[in-house]
Structures are given as C-alpha cells and as structure tokens.
Swiss-Prot record:
The keyword Transferase applies. The gene is aroA. GO terms for cellular component: cytoplasm. 3-phosphoshikimate binds at residues 23-24, 28, 165, 167, 312, 339. Pathway: Metabolic intermediate biosynthesis; chorismate biosynthesis; chorismate from D-erythrose 4-phosphate and phosphoenolpyruvate: step 6/7. It comes from Sulfurimonas denitrificans (strain ATCC 33889 / DSM 1251). Catalyzes the transfer of the enolpyruvyl moiety of phosphoenolpyruvate (PEP) to the 5-hydroxyl of shikimate-3-phosphate (S3P) to produce enolpyruvyl shikimate-3-phosphate and inorganic phosphate. This is 3-phosphoshikimate 1-carboxyvinyltransferase. Keywords: Amino-acid biosynthesis, Aromatic amino acid biosynthesis, Cytoplasm, Transferase. Belongs to the EPSP synthase family. NCBIfam families: aroA (TIGR01356).
Length: 428
C-alpha cells in the first residue's frame, strides 16, 4: 500500500489541458463501437485502469483494436463468446453497461471485478433485465458479481425506475436496441445522458421527452464513432475546489465536457460564492469548453436536487463545505453508500478527523464550516475519497493512505497536483 503526504499550497495560477479524459464517455466509446458498421476512431481515450479494462473486454468479445498511442480504432463484426472471464476491475459502470450490451448477445459470458466491485449491488440491473427475458445470474440471487449471462431474446418494455441512475438507464437502453419492439424507460429525475446523446448521434432511434426515454430497436448497425473524448468534469472538479479554497488562486480547466448533467457540482460551487465562468468552444455529441475558477469566500448551501448529476463530486464538494461559512447540508444522497466505499461514512469520518463538525444521517450529512487541520486519512480503496482529502491538504497539509486506487480514473493526478503544491510518497 502506498501513501502520500501533501503540503499546504501557496496561492497558485494554473491553466491546464491535461485533466484526465472523461471516464463515462471513454467506457461508452469502447462498448458502442461494438454496435457500429465500420471502424470507430477515438482520440484522447482515458488510459486509466477502469476504461482500459473495458477496452480489453471489447477485444475479448471479438473486436479488432488498433491503438497507435494517440488514436484507438475499433471495428467489430458482432459480439463473440469469450473463453475469458470479463474483468471489469473496479468499474461499476463497466459491469452494469456490459450487462445490458450482452443480455441479447449470442453466447455465454461471465463478468467479474476486484474485491470492491464484487461487493457492490447489481440487482438494480439484473432484476429489470431478467424481467424482459435476460438470462442473468450471480451471487445472492444476482445481486453480487461474478455475474453469468446467457444471451437471450428480449421483450419490449416500459420500465419505471425507482432511482435516477445513468448506469441503470444505459443498461436498459442497450438492451432495448435489440428488444422485440419499441421500449420506454422513465426515471424519477433526469440522470446523466451521455448514452442517449452518443447513440442518437450514431443513428439510434432514441427520443427523450422529459423523464421518459423512448427507444426503437436497431434496424441496422449504427454509424461508427469519430470522437475526441473531452476532459472529465468529475476529475477537473478536484482542481476547481483547490482553487476555490486557496486564497488568491485560480485555475482554467480546458476541453471539459459542459454537458449540463455533468457540471452540477460546478454550479453548486458557484452557489457557494466561487467565481466560475464557462467558455464553450465546440460541440461533439455534447458541448465542450473551458471552465475558469477563481477563489472567493464560500458560504454554506443545501444540496438536495439533481443529486445524480453530482453524486461523484460530492466528496470533493464536501471539502469546500468544510471551508465555507455556515452549515452545508446534503440530502437524498443515499446512493453514496453503495459506491466504491460507503462515501457518506468515509466523508463524515474523514472530515471529523480533520477537525470539522459533521452529522451523519441515512441519506446524507451536514458539515459546519471551520478550519481544516492535518490528519491521516484512509481512502478505503476509493479513488474519489483519496483525491478529495488530498485536495483538502492544499489548505493544511494531509496524509492519505492507499492511493493506488487513483489510477482507476485519473492516472496523471499527481503530475498536475505537483504544479500547485509539494507532495511526498511513501510505501507502507
């Protein structure tokens, strides 16, 4: 296990185009290329553990992959049965979306992952897929990986999801593309929409009407992707928080997706008083541009709406809460408990270790702003917890243990961090 010591930062000014490529889009690029007629061309693909696992799975499913280090070309003449266990590593997105993709494929497939992924709930995917005819099973009656899939004919469906989850929605959309009739999917609030945007751009017949997504089965293979993957706003947000809590600091985050369902955390930071400006530069399946963030004194807010739009950024946003004036409140965020760790407990315990007053409830927590103090934090193998408390360290210094998990989403995180503060690594 490795550890990092982060030192308090002085005022900094950083402009960077080196934020990690978007993880959600990279996963989808690898998978959706399997549905295309022709060769998909993907530049700036995220070369992190999670997404490279998805790329390896696609190859194991019969795709031809040509990677020159800059552009990845993927071509496929259909999904083939693999003799390998399909290893999703740490990625819940990978496992859940592959369930939807493979549920109608000809063959038998086994999906597994690391010790953390094998503890995460999968019934939210396996249950609705089983209801439409998928032959899918796993431990605890399909709730835990490894998952076994035998491709089958799928029935048309009208599914009403009880949770707002882009992973559930995406899995059902992928299943719907090969169902025996038109399908619809509804959710209690709009979740992230990369799948709809990308598949529609490839020629899939998908219509979104409020909270209802309607999908027609594919009549033919889709057009291949040609995309430069934008920077990941979830990764960019760590450095936005660093600038927002460090007096006289600013950062410009270049080439980030400005998809409204992905920048809600920036909007929350803006409501707290941070000086944030968005600069659109292009549109490739979705808007892309630069985000400018400057330090300003922060005030407390309540976060309870559109939770699925900022669920991944809440740990980092909580560091901003700890530096704000007043009590910030998080509600309706019970989904945090089934991420790579129980992120409600890990955030609460981490902030308490840093001297911050925090109260935990079943679906969230409250944070009374104060002065962060240096502490020793265990990431619990969760990349977002690790990076969030490392960013907290720019205000006071911090030691964070078990940092290898950061490679699942942001391999060059420390290269960028070194541009704003001093870090030291140790092996335990």
């Amino acid at each position: 296990m490795s550890s990092v010591k982060v030192y308090k930062a002085l005022a900094f000014s950083l402009r960077t185009s080196e934020i990690a490529s978007d993880k959600s889009i990279s996963h989808r690029c690898a998978m959706f290329a399997m549905l295309a007629d022709g060769t998909s061309q993907i530049t700036n693909f995220l070369r992190a553990e999670d997404t490279m696992n998805s790329l390896k799975i696609v190859k194991n499913l019969g795709a031809t992959i040509d990677d020159d280090g800059e552009t990845i070309k993927i071509s496929s003449d259909g999904i083939k049965e693999s003799s390998e266990v399909l290893d999703c590593g740490n990625s819940g997105t990978g496992m859940r979306l592959f369930c939807g993709l493979l549920s109608s494929a000809d063959g038998h497939f086994v999906l597994s992952g690391d010790e953390y992924l094998r503890r995460r709930p999968m019934k939210r995917i396996t249950a609705p897929l089983r209801d439409i005819g998928a032959k899918l099973d796993g431990r605890e009656n399909g709730d835990l990986a490894p998952l076994s899939i035998r491709g089958a004919s799928l029935k048309a469906f009208n599914y009403e999801s009880k949770i707002a989850s882009a992973q559930v929605k995406s899995a059902m959309i992928l299943a719907a593309l090969r169902a025996d009739g038109e399908c619809s999917f509804s959710e209690p609030e709009l979740s992230r929409d990369h799948t709809e945007r990308m598949l529609k751009g490839m020629g899939a017949e998908i219509e979104v009407e409020g909270l209802i997504t309607k999908i027609k089965p594919m009549k033919k293979l889709l057009s291949p992707l040609k995309i430069r993957v934008p920077a990941d706003p979830s990764s960019a947000f760590f450095f936005a928080v660093a600038a927002a809590i460090t007096p006289n600091s600013n950062v410009v985050l270049e080439g980030v997706t400005l998809n409204p369902t992905r920048i809600e955390a920036f909007k929350a930071l803006e409501r707290m008083g941070a000086d944030i400006r968005y600069e659109a530069t292009e549109n490739i399946y979705e808007p892309i541009g630069n985000i400018h963030v400057k330090y300003a004194p922060l005030k407390a807010i309540t976060v309870e709406d559109n939770i699925s739009w900022l669920i991944d950024e809440l740990p980092a946003l909580s560091i901003a809460f700890a530096c704000a004036d007043g009590v910030s409140i998080v509600k309706n965020a019970q989904e945090l408990r089934v991420k790579e760790s129980d992120r409600i407990s890990t955030v609460v315990n981490g902030l308490k270790a840093c001297g911050i007053e925090v109260d935990e409830v079943h679906d969230g927590y409250s944070v009374k702003g104060g002065v962060l103090k240096e502490a020793k934090i265990d990431s619990h193998g969760d990349h977002r917890i690790a990076m969030s408390f490392i960013i907290a360290g720019v205000t006071c210094g911090m030691r964070v243990d078990d940092i290898a998990c950061i490679n699942t989403s942001f391999p060059n995180f420390f290269e960028l961090l070194k541009k704003i503060t001093k870090v030291e690594f140790t092996s335990l």
